[in-house]
């Protein structure tokens, strides 16, 4: 049963990002990003990462909701464009779904998942194994590993969020 739930959440996750990338009105784009963020947190929760799912939910949906609230307030339209109101937007949505489907079929044919995921460099993370001691939480050890071995990942994430805010401010500034 859990496999089916994760499978359905994954399908909703991909469809929501295709729906966002087909460029509807900013109101619906923000709504789709909120839905995809909540579904992504549900996927993380289904794999047992309750702390990480909660942090993503609070940071992403809290911070980005404010940004999209301001952008939709600045870009309000009398008749917002939905996916079926314009043939170009609907075509982009359908083409995005078809390309995702073809990519999934290409990756999954003949069990070629090894070409996408390889776990060769996992030896460094074994240091943070909590074992059966019961004193340390696995999530706390994961956060410690993220900040020690994944310093570059934290820096790139912070920089990309900063650039994202600058781009949103530039787009909504107007003429």
Curated annotation (Swiss-Prot):
EC identifiers of the protein: 7.1.1.2
Pfam families: Oxidored_q3
Main location: mitochondrion
Organism: Halichoerus grypus
Protein's recorded name: NADH-ubiquinone oxidoreductase chain 6
UniProt KW keywords: Electron transport, Membrane, Mitochondrion, Mitochondrion inner membrane, NAD, Respiratory chain, Translocase, Transmembrane, Transmembrane helix, Transport, Ubiquinone
Lineage summary: Eukaryota, Metazoa, Chordata, Craniata, Vertebrata
UniProt subunit comment: Core subunit of respiratory chain NADH dehydrogenase (Complex I) which is composed of 45 different subunits.
Gene name per UniProt: MT-ND6
Similarity-based family: Belongs to the complex I subunit 6 family.
Gene Ontology terms: cellular component: mitochondrial inner membrane
Catalytic activity: a ubiquinone + NADH + 5 H(+)(in) = a ubiquinol + NAD(+) + 4 H(+)(out)
Function: Core subunit of the mitochondrial membrane respiratory chain NADH dehydrogenase (Complex I) which catalyzes electron transfer from NADH through the respiratory chain, using ubiquinone as an electron acceptor. Essential for the catalytic activity and assembly of complex I.
Spans through the membrane: 1-21, 25-45, 47-67, 88-108, 149-169
Compartments (UniProt record): Mitochondrion inner membrane
Membrane topology: Multi-pass membrane protein
